[in-house]
Amino acid sequence: MAQQVQSEIRYLTPPSVDVKKKKYCRFKKSGIKYIDYKDPEFLKKFLNEQGKILPRRITGTSLKFQRRIAQAVKRARHLALLPFVTDMMK
């Protein structure tokens, strides 16, 4: 009976950890210096479905360009190019 109990013991295998690709700042890579607030289609890439600005850890942008994105989105909202709040933006 002791052998039967030992054979039923199952060891947990460690979860497979997928190596994620390193996030990079697309602005530094492509050499973009100015983020145009008059281009709402480009700015929508950095917004979620509710119209909120996506954080850096998701988009992978650097701090410098994240601030510029936030400023451009806020300017576009004031000019009514982007909505402040929405249900299904994308």
Swiss-Prot record:
Keyword terms, alphabetized: Ribonucleoprotein, Ribosomal protein, RNA-binding, rRNA-binding
Domain of life: Bacteria
Example of a GO cellular component annotation carried by this entry: cytosolic small ribosomal subunit
BP term (GO), one: translation
InterPro entries given in the database record: Ribosomal_bS18, Ribosomal_bS18_CS, Ribosomal_bS18_sf
A Pfam match: Ribosomal_S18
PROSITE patterns in the record: RIBOSOMAL_S18
One MF term in the entry's GO annotations: small ribosomal subunit rRNA binding
Job description of the protein: Binds as a heterodimer with protein bS6 to the central domain of the 16S rRNA, where it helps stabilize the platform of the 30S subunit.
NCBIfam families: S18
Record family assignment: Belongs to the bacterial ribosomal protein bS18 family.
Subunit structure: Part of the 30S ribosomal subunit. Forms a tight heterodimer with protein bS6.
Protein name per its UniProtKB record: Small ribosomal subunit protein bS18
Gene, per the UniProt record: rpsR
